[in-house]
Swiss-Prot record:
Identification of the protein by name: Protein CROWDED NUCLEI 3
Sites of the Glycyl lysine isopeptide (Lys-Gly) (interchain with G-Cter in ubiquitin) crosslink: 318, 661
Cellular localization per UniProt: Nucleus membrane; Nucleus, Nucleoplasm; Cytoplasm; Nucleus lamina
Primary location group: nucleus
UniProt membrane topology term: Peripheral membrane protein
Biased composition (Basic residues): 854-868
Residue ranges of the motif Nuclear localization signal: 404-411
GN (gene name): CRWN3
Source organism per UniProt: Arabidopsis thaliana
Tissues showing expression: Expressed at low levels in roots, leaves, flowers and flower stalks.
Keywords: Coiled coil, Cytoplasm, Isopeptide bond, Membrane, Nucleus, Phosphoprotein, Ubl conjugation
Compositionally biased region (Acidic residues): 1045-1066
Coiled-coil spans in chain: 51-149, 185-695
Amino acid sequence: MFTPQRNRWPETDRKGKAIAFSDEIITPPPQRVLLREDDDWQKFKEVGLLDEASLERKDRDALIEKILKLEKELFDYQHNMGLLLIEKKQWTSTNNELQQAYDEAMEMLKREKTSNAITLNEADKREENLRKALIDEKQFVAELENDLKYWQREHSVVKSTSEAKLEEANALVIGMKEKALEVDRERAIAEEKFSVMNRKSSELERKLKEVETREKVHQREHLSLVTEREAHEAVFYKQREDLQEWEKKLTLEEDRLSEVKRSINHREERVMENERTIEKKEKILENLQQKISVAKSELTEKEESIKIKLNDISLKEKDFEAMKAKVDIKEKELHEFEENLIEREQMEIGKLLDDQKAVLDSRRREFEMELEQMRRSLDEELEGKKAEIEQLQVEISHKEEKLAKREAALEKKEEGVKKKEKDLDARLKTVKEKEKALKAEEKKLHMENERLLEDKECLRKLKDEIEEIGTETTKQESRIREEHESLRITKEERVEFLRLQSELKQQIDKVKQEEELLLKEREELKQDKERFEKEWEALDKKRANITREQNEVAEENEKLRNLQISEKHRLKREEMTSRDNLKRELDGVKMQKESFEADMEDLEMQKRNLDMEFQRQEEAGERDFNERARTYEKRSQEELDNINYTKKLAQREMEEMQYEKLALEREREQISVRKKLLKEQEAEMHKDITELDVLRSSLKEKRKEFICERERFLVFLEKLKSCSSCGEITENFVLSDLRLPDVEDGDKRFGKQKLKAEEALNISPSAENSKRTSLLGKIASKLLSISPIGKTDKVTDLGITVKLPESSQPDDSLDRVSGEDHEPSATEQSFTDSRIQEGPEGSLQSEMKSDKPRRGRGRGRGRGKSVRGRSQATKAVSRDSKPSDGETPRKRQREQTSRITESEQAAGDSDEGVDSITTGGRRKKRQIAVPVSQTPGQTRYQLRRHRNVGTEEDKAQASKGATEKQERVNDDIRKVPSPKETRTPPEGENRENGKAEVLVETVTHEEIVTVETETVFKVNNTGKNPVEDPQLEVGGSGEIREHGEEDDENISMIEEENEGEEEEETERQGNDASIGKKIWVFFTT
């Protein structure tokens, strides 16, 4: 309980959270009576409860530190709020952009669906007309169907396995640290394997050089086949009319297919962009979750710190209460001590007075008895004086009793005041509103204290009066003594009187000394009381300060609790908002995924429809399909076994994940390199467009010259009619076939083609980075390249021959797809002139394709191919070998007829081919299987994603080759020759002046690449006479190329040795046997 608050306690100094006390106030040392309380006073000094300045200073420092900490926390919260608002704005903007992109994608999908429905209806109408063309295409389509199904199955399996792997990877992340050393070792092993792969690439280059030597051997053999080709060219003229009709239909189909390809490419690009944005969002969501977890951890730490502070405050409060209890106990002890002192004073004063009275009475009686006889008069006076003295003593005793009563009343009042103080303390703790009443009571107590002080002053005055009475008694005694001296007394009486006087003096001195001692003790007690009252007032002040601090601490605690509650609510709101945003974004992502899956399902439905159409025409190729299905089933079973085995081995899967990460990094580097190449290719495409403009202007002039050449050719035909051997062939010509199309029609078609090229430049090349785009591009390009109708659209009749760089010729000879079986002669010049605009574009596409470094693309990553690749290769050879063995004699006849007239009409071809290259340049191989309506970024500039990026030296060689090619094209401008000079030279001249370039057909256990040969003769730089191999039927080279790319990931050294042995066998048989026999030998091996 507290004492009354007379004055507030002084504030104590604080150091941090604890309370430190100083001992600056020097209390006066207690007297003899308070020696036992010395320890208590020393404890007060040590604790520092009496130091006001230090307590105030420490409280201020502690409060300032708290305020600074709270301000810092507020600034941090404000900063975090600002960051969260900025992030929210960014997310809203990104969400709007994604919504816009999604709406655009849905609109495009609707448009594409309608266009696809229209194209399907038209395709149903033209189904009867296209059955003949689809006989050669259905084999490739069947393989593509199997590929698509296989990829779909692989996609589903990969999805399931990827999900399982992700779950297992999340479980195995904990053990990643332990496996870091093993990963480093495996890196070293991978580097060793990389060195081995480099060594193998050097071996492949050596083998490519050997292939070049084989090409030379096949060129020599090709000269022997020229005569056979002339016989086949006659059959070609009969098919010309059918091809013209097919061409008109296929041009429309090609345009529509090109539009479908572009739409598919756009769609796939958007899908890839959506996937990338989804990945970025997932990363951002992970970062946000990490930030939220960090903020939660910080909040938990702050809560713990606040709890610690509250615990410290509670401990301090307990210590303060204990100190209060000690102070109350000491106050009670002091009150008891004061009461004991007062009682002792009263007892001693009473005893002294009684003793003095008794002594004085006895002595006075004796003195009176002795003096009665001598001095009766004096006795009477003395008795009167004694009576007066007794009255005075009675009055003094009455006054002392009154003083004792007053002191008892004051003590009672003090006890009542203490009780009131206790009540007030209880009321202060319970009710704050009663502070005013307590202040009023405190004023009353102050008044009562003042009254007590006034009573004490009255007691002092009474004591002064007692002293005055004592002085008067001494004076009266002196008077009595004088009167006694005045009396005549005998000597004995004088002696006795003197003795009595001395005794009285001694007794009076003793009484005075005792009174002085009592006065001194009273003064000391008064001083002690004053000191105690001062200390009590100081304690009251400190108590008031402590109560004020407690109130402030309670307010601060309430504020902190309110802040905590508000911050918790705010964090909960932010968490709710962030969760809502995350849910919305996840819903958006799910919607995008669902839309993407719906798009894929639509594409799959379209593919299934196409599959149903193509399955009607699969009766002829069931055997090949069954064999390949068996091989695919075996391979799928093996892969399923491998997958089950890999599931059991979690460590290997983690290693594969790491290797995949490295591969992704390499792919990123490849993508950066490809972007640079695409920029260069865009610049080249702009240059090509300008060149096409120049070519268009030059072709107008050349058509006029070609009309003159046509007239010369007609004169030449009239001369040949007289010949017995050539008359029948020349009679089949129709003059209407040699009509040239109008120049305006050519200009219009050239303008359309130019617009297509410009649109191709604006399409972003990111779609070529995905495997899906490459597959779709392969499907479209091969459908056009394999069909016999599309073969008439090639621009090889222009005679553009540009020699490839030496570094890329072997690769092109192995990788390039042979897309045509014949070389159109000059008699079908009217047919080729209608499409003469498409020639430069195709030539430039073949140039860019030949300039790409492809070393290690089909064979660099490993000669070991899977069973699936082998079966496809062998089937392609079987298809190629059938027409060479005589199953398609009609084609052979056509090639012979075309070969007869080709040498006769070479002048027109050479003239037109030379003029078509306005920029000049060296001649190159004939364009092979390059459709005019190509999708941008597919095969024209070789924008397809490479499996392995070439070194910097290969890139430098490729760029150098491109620049050299451009310089050669700018320097070569040829003259118009006469028809006579274009005849086929003899065999010796062909070997000396001409150049025979042969694409070698190589057959291994893994793949078969059939290549079309072509001989280009130069006669005094005035013309060329291309001669084509009639026995090479091209139907599956594109398939083998693609399957080679798909299956070149499995490396086996055993199959590499088998391939080397088979190449040696081809070299042995190359000089003796024909191409058909070689194919049969390779097929049997």
